[in-house]
């Protein structure tokens, strides 16, 4: 009788421990309040504005999916790539610019699901800007000038401009007087407007973001060239995110992007007007541009 009783108590204890363990595991599952889905953004615009828009979208996502999200804006594009590359990952979702996404995808740490729509298109262009009286009218004039870029991994602000400078006979490594890392496209425009840089490159048309602070920016800072088409940024997932969870988030984001409130939040963060579903193959034509230029994607991380 005593032995049976002891066995019964042992079984009850084991059951209680396993239930408690399972409950603890459930509480710590990804997307729970204690273990939120981390969504990392790059600082393509003014960081406070990007952060505010990202947080609004995350709140809407939580309401739609029941998952908890933790958003952050990295100080550099490479910071998001490194967060995805960590083991365990320090980012489960990302909104990477084109080149940074290709770099992360080549490492096997990011998979595209959504591409942003701006002005009705899932692609965009970069632009070269300078002061209206600078005397600079084409890329070949950049030699000996100070160039402002948003980030070393920014597609429209540095990667494509590098390719176009080389094509025009200007070596970006040796022929420029200086390269200024402005930190965002907004501050590239500011640098050119204030004379801290002779020329810069941004997405089209980053100048509009500064019209409130500089009412004459559209007149004083002029566009002297527009780059080839570039796939827009979007939403990417770490491969460890399950298809089920990924599908729920994608569906919710598509729903959010169709509402006025959602559009406003997406526009605040990144000037996104909508979202389209595209996988990694959407970026293949741009990969071909990089390959044709002889650019080593991973070398730029070193």
Roles of regions detected by a PLM:
Residues 1-34, 130, 302:
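Short, low-complexity disordered leader/linker segments with a strong preference
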Residues 32-41, 45-59, 230, 236-237, ...:
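An extracytoplasmic/periplasmic, membrane-proximal ligand-sensing/linker region
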Residues 34-64, 99, 122-190, 194, ...:
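Bilobed "Venus flytrap"/periplasmic-binding protein-like clamshell domains
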Residues 64-68, 88, 95-98, 105, ...:
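Sec/Tat-exported extracytoplasmic proteins
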Residues 68-76, 174-184, 222-225:
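Short beta-strand-to-loop elements that line the ligand-binding cleft
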Residues 79-141:
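Acidic, polar ligand-binding/catalytic clefts
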Residues 98, 204-205, 227, 239:
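Short secondary-structure boundary segments
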Residues 104-116, 210-224:
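Ligand-binding "clamshell"
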């Amino acid at each position: 009788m005593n032995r049976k009783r002891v066995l019964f108590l042992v079984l009850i204890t084991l059951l209680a421990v396993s239930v408690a363990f399972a409950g603890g595991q459930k509480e710590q599952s990804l997307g729970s309040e204690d273990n939120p889905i981390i969504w990392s953004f790059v600082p393509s615009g003014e960081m406070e504005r990007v952060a505010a828009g990202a947080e609004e979208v995350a709140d809407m996502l939580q309401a739609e999916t029941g998952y908890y999200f933790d958003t952050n804006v990295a100080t550099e594009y490479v910071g998001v790539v490194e967060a995805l590359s960590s083991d365990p990952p320090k980012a489960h979702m990302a909104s990477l610019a084109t080149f940074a996404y290709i770099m992360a995808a080549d490492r096997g740490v990011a998979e595209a699901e959504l591409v942003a729509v701006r002005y009705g298109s899932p692609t965009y262009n970069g632009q070269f800007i300078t002061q209206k009286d600078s005397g600079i009218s084409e890329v070949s004039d950049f030699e000996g000038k100070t160039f402002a870029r948003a980030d070393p991994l920014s597609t429209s602000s540095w990667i494509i401009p590098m390719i176009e400078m080389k094509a025009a006979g200007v070596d970006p490594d040796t022929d420029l007087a200086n390269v200024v890392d402005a930190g965002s496209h907004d501050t590239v425009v500011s640098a050119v407007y204030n004379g801290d840089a002779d020329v810069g490159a941004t997405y089209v048309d980053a100048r509009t973001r500064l019209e409130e602070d500089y009412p004459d920016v559209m007149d004083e800072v002029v566009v002297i060239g527009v780059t080839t088409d570039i796939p827009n940024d979007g939403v990417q997932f770490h491969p460890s995110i399950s298809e089920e969870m990924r599908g729920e988030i994608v569906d919710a984001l598509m729903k959010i992007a169709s509402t006025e409130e959602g559009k406003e939040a997406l526009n605040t963060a990144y000037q996104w007007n909508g979202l389209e579903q595209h996988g990694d193959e959407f970026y293949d034509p741009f990969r071909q541009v990089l390959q044709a230029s002889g650019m080593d994607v991973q070398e730029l991380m070193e």
